[in-house]
Curated annotation (Swiss-Prot):
Name of the protein in its database record: Ribosomal protein L11 methyltransferase
Gene source species: Clostridium perfringens (strain ATCC 13124 / DSM 756 / JCM 1290 / NCIMB 6125 / NCTC 8237 / Type A)
Enzyme Commission code: 2.1.1.-
Location in the cell: Cytoplasm
Gene Ontology annotations of biological process type: methylation
Gene behind the chain: prmA
PANTHER family the UniProt entry points to: ELECTRON TRANSFER FLAVOPROTEIN BETA SUBUNIT LYSINE METHYLTRANSFERASE (PTHR43648:SF1)
Record function comment: Methylates ribosomal protein L11.
Gene3D superfamilies from the UniProt entry: Vaccinia Virus protein VP39
Length: 313
């Protein structure tokens, strides 16, 4: 998207997001965005996250969600608004609670559209020490807090996903001063940065996505650390040497494929921290780890997700 665009938005409730999104998808719009406070407020939060949440989100908890469609200036916006209003009214008449159901329009520039999501990404404290802070926010650490500066861009890993949180908590438990850590599927570099901040001697991040590699390298530069290396390549194929800890926040099927390579990449008694595992795939991963000579030490759960910590026997 370039230049000036028209944002048409419907003020609604969380339960009406899907059908109202469908209205926009049925039009020739250039993009659809959804803002749902329940995505932020619906999970258990620590006090720091609550303190840094936008006041608008807190005020509208459970009441307001927004669906936005983006249109070219050449589009007949009056017709678009009339059509959206008509369809929202039909949903209301069908018995769906659409909340306010108001339709608004606003001219926006590409930069506004591209950065609008940032207002929902705030500092998050994970455990006792780690604070994940977006680079555009201010935060003053206290006590032993360690701040990871992050601009996730298009790469996965912001700290607010259950799988990332559990991996951070596991790293906090197992990383020691002389530890070497491999981060497989590094994404934004968040786990590599956490390992570095916790005192790891050397950290290596690997990802198949060149966008993720660039994102991780940029985030490393924000944090002024010099013990992290990021490589583009086929996971462990590009890794030399061995690690004391391998962390992989991916999906269960890929984890099972990687277990043999992880085994080769770990020192004796090395730790494998892995997440991205839904409940239905948990036992599959445990079985594979045990078949390959790992001892499962922990199975942690958060929402629909699991994090498994295993030691190479």
């Amino acid at each position: 998207m370039e230049g000036t665009w028209i944002e048409v938005r419907v003020i609604t409730k969380s339960e009406a997001l899907e059908p109202i999104s469908g209205i926009f998808y049925g039009l020739d719009c250039k993009g659809v965005a959804i803002e749902d406070p329940n995505d932020i407020l619906g999970r258990e939060q620590g006090p720091l996250t609550w303190d840094f949440a936008d006041i608008n989100i807190l005020e509208h908890k459970g009441k307001v969600a927004v669906v936005k469609g983006y249109f070219s200036e050449e589009d007949n916006i009056d017709d678009v608004i009339a059509y959206v209003k008509e369809r929202v009214e039909e949903l209301k008449e069908s018995g769906l609670d659409v909340g306010e159901g108001t339709v608004e329009a606003e001219k926006m520039f590409e930069e506004d559209w591209a950065n609008n999501w940032k207002k929902y990404y705030k500092p998050i404290k994970i455990g006792e020490k780690i604070v994940i802070k977006p680079i555009w926010e201010e935060y003053e650490p206290t006590g032993e807090e360690m701040v990871v500066e992050l601009d996730p861009g298009m790469a996965f890993g912001t700290g607010d996903h259950e799988t990332t949180r559990m991996c951070v908590q596991a790293l906090d438990k197992y990383v020691k001063a002389d530890t070497t850590v491999f981060d497989i599927g590094t994404g934004s570099g968040i786990l590599a940065l956490v390992a570095s901040k916790l005192g790891a001697k050397h950290v290596l991040g690997v990802d198949l996505d060149p966008v993720a590699v660039d994102s991780a390298k940029e985030n490393i530069s924000f944090n002024n650390v010099d013990n992290i290396e990021v490589l583009y390549g086929n996971l462990l194929d590009v890794v030399d040497g061995k690690a004391d800890i391998v962390v992989a926040n991916i999906i269960a099927e890929i984890i099972c494929i990687l277990v043999d390579d992880v085994k080769k990449a770990l020192n004796k008694d090395g730790i494998f921290i892995t997440s991205g595992i839904i409940h239905e795939r948990r036992q599959m991963v445990i079985d594979k780890l045990e078949q390959e000579g790992f001892e499962v030490m922990e199975v942690n759960k958060d929402g629909e997700w699991n994090c498994i910590v295993a030691k190479l026997k």
